[in-house]
């Protein structure tokens, strides 16, 4: 179930910004929550109400709902876990990206959007090829 992890305080804002934090409960090895907090902070300073949703295992990525998608880094184990779920989101993610959706992918998130990556243990993990 998609859940909201961060939300701007209630007040008048000029804009609304909806951010998907892909697998934010699993992919946060290098402090990627800090990246999301900075996106929220800067957007609020520029007059945007911000809502950040964690889109994780078994959740639908609604390509029409999000203004920005963020996909952070993770350890090999977490990447191998979500690599099994990621194909269920491929069509919507590909459509989102190929039609001008904003995606900030870092480290493992970037790898998982490519063709494949090789774990430290030499195992090949197939990715989305977007």
What is each of the regions a protein language model found here?
Residues 1-98:
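N-terminal beta1-alpha1 cap of cysteine-dependent amidohydrolase-like domains
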Residues 76-130:
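Cysteine-nucleophile active-site neighborhood
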